[in-house]
Amino acid sequence: MVEKKFLEAVKKYSLISEGDRILVAFSGGIDSTVLTYLLIKFRDHLKISDIYLAHLNHSLRKESDEDQRFCEDFAKKYGLEIFTKKVDIKSLAEKEKKSIEQKAREERYSFFRKVMEERSINRLATGHHLSDLVETMIMWFIQGNRKGIKGFRPKERDIIRPLYLINKDQIENYAREKGIEYRIDITNFETDFLRNRIRHNIIPHIKGINPSLEGSLLTLSYFLSLDDQYLEEESEKISQKFLNGKIELEELLVYDKALVYRAIQNWIYRKTGVYPSYRQIMDIMEIIEKKEGTKSIRLSPEYNLIRRYSTLYIEKVKEKTEPYQYRIKPGEKIFVKEANLYIKSYIETDYTLDKLKDERKKVCFQIESMEDAEFVVRNRRKGDRFIPFGRKKEKKLKDVMIDLKIPSDMRENIPLVVYGNKILWIAGYKRSAYFPVTEKGKKLICFELEEV
């Protein structure tokens, strides 16, 4: 039965081709040992060129070194080349603030990839089987993970799972019949970890309701994978449209929500290497439906997703801007590091009123005794008020910035040019009503932005 299902999976899913060089992820446990035994037995039949073993010693159990010796002896017995590496997973996980399971997986696959690259190996075979598939689907269902609930496929790029159609009981019976020795990991019989609780407590109860649980979930996995593949391909086409670094919501929201959230996931992953959680995706979907103001969501310690009105951006997390202040006199030029720009001040005598209309990059004021005047460039302070040009009444600076649609996450950085207690200019946005230019021929004090 096991051998028949092994060969069926190899053929049905095109797992092995003539001349393949296969690296087995070899723990010494029953699954990887039976897998290796089957590969050796059918090596000639499947025309496999080479079989190699790779064992990562996680240093998690007192028996870890004995596990490694077993793997080395097994390789020697069957004339296979084995690659081993020893790492302290617990210390690495603590240092990087990751779970032991996550860090162990990262180290294993990094090790496997290195071996494959160095030895020109084109297939990585793992011992995942049908019972693993069932456990995985139930585990992700319990955790509400859409991407994981479909389980794993028998073949994903160069990773193959030849035991895909074989369950755990069948593997154990086969090992017993063939006298195959293997290492036993006692943690597999503990119930502290979610997967083991599913294996030993939950699945037996479900099988009491549906004895064909494995077959049912195998079929479900197949159809969920088909749906997922199609939606991923379509959403990838959408995310490709936003390679310039931002998303215009008018262009995105013409698509169905099933594609929108996937496109956003792909876009975020491509930009940051971070795969957003479902809680984050739900928050993102909520804020993109509202186009007023600015909203942000922390994706990771390094990145924020920001919606500024109808546009989505991804930006690195900025340190909180502290109050800053610079002094500037006519004829001087200063660098405002907090805004990453220069502001220069100078006296203007040759001008026309028409040329003074661009208040975003340059503003001029008609101030008496300007040669001795000293101005301050600073960011906003609590209680700041401002009189926009063309108005007579003061407004709260915060309200003016909202009217100008200045994103909330940028307001602390924007330079203000101040004279005495009067804010003359919201640099790059709006001049005040103070000291308007009313007569030609008068000397003017001007301020101009220069970007780095």
From Swiss-Prot:
Record-given protein name: tRNA(Ile)-lysidine synthase
GO terms classed as biological process: tRNA modification
Function, in words: Ligates lysine onto the cytidine present at position 34 of the AUA codon-specific tRNA(Ile) that contains the anticodon CAU, in an ATP-dependent manner. Cytidine is converted to lysidine, thus changing the amino acid specificity of the tRNA from methionine to isoleucine.
Signal peptide per UniProt: none
GO cellular component: cytoplasm
InterPro entries according to UniProt: Lysidine-tRNA-synth_C, Rossmann-like_a/b/a_fold, TilS/TtcA_N, tRNA_Ile_lys_synt, tRNA_Ile_lys_synt_N
EC number(s) from the headed UniProt entry: 6.3.4.19
Cell inner membrane listed as a keyword: no
Gene Ontology molecular function terms on file: ATP binding; tRNA(Ile)-lysidine synthase activity
Family: Belongs to the tRNA(Ile)-lysidine synthase family.
Gene: tilS
Organism classification: Bacteria, Pseudomonadati, Aquificota, Aquificia, Aquificales
Location(s) in or outside the cell: Cytoplasm
Domain notes: The N-terminal region contains the highly conserved SGGXDS motif, predicted to be a P-loop motif involved in ATP binding.
Pfam (any one): ATP_bind_3
Principal cellular location given in the protein's record: cytoplasm
PANTHER family referenced in this protein's UniProt entry, alphabetically: TRNA(ILE)-LYSIDINE SYNTHASE-RELATED
